[in-house]
Amino acid sequence: KVEKLQSKVLNEQREVVVQLPKGYAENPDKKYPVIYRLDGAGNLTMMNAVLESLQSQNAAPEVIIVAIENTDRLRDLYPTANEDPNGPVGYGGGGANFLSFITTELMPIVEKKYRVHDFRVIEGASAGGVFALYALSQKPELFNAALTYSAAVWWNYGASAKSTVAFLKSANHLDHFIYTSIGNEGAPMRPYYNDMISGMRANQPAGLRWENEAYEGVTHNLVSAASTFSAYHHLFLSAYLRPQQFSGDIKSIKDYYARVSKQRGEKLDAPEWVIRELGYHYVGKQNYDKAIALFKYDIAEYPQTPDAYNGLAYGYEQMGEYKKALESVNQALALSTSE
């Protein structure tokens, strides 16, 4: 759906394309996270292909996409005017106004007309990547994540690289996600980008999830295509906690699903089989104490589910604790026959 609005901040008419999830009309009570995609609806085909693949595996939620069309791209997406002769001198500097347009004019319309919850992502490439980093640093209370592809941080002698590092350095804790990537960039881009990555690594605050990837041999204009799957895959938490994501602390299961719930705007708990599979994983590693603790936690969460007791029985059997295994099997049978 195309939304047109007359912006008082920018003093011009702006156009955005709002794409709703396929099941939007069939789920009138459901709310969705929002991706604000810079550089317009030309990105929707690629975004949809990646998101649908992830959604088919429950590895990403359904989302509302707000694709913002350009009018004066350099003006809007660069926060500072460029003084570096490697680029167009005097261009840029309208980022603050553009951010104000998004947060004070566009967002209120989106949140009034559509069923959204408060998990918001800002995503962009090149100049759009610069703006996404800027938006997160200026409005961390509004954006939960910034996805940036080959962000043109060389602009104005690396102003964006420096401000991004300064933002992270000033943050004691940041419960956000940042994705950065780069292709086969040379000068003037690469030195500023490398400095930014080094600074981000040295000043990464507690709580920040950050992924950085380099796609050597991939040109600047193809980095978005190379990065989109990885960015979404790292950003969105699967509804199914995998063993490699499990810290080993049972409390972390609830913490993980609290974060999944925050992303998806609905309360999600660990499915019974997910907890049981974690137990099986530790049986396979012969870490029986951890496995038994997980199986017992599974029973505590799902006391009326026979399979939870079967998991515990399996753990005890592998330990050679046959009496305890038999007790668990009998509990599973009792529940099965009472159903």
Where are these regions (language model features)?
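Non-catalytic cap/lid and distal C-terminal segments of serine-dependent acyl enzymes
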Residues: 1-319, 328-331, 337-339
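Beta-loop motif signature
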Residues: 322
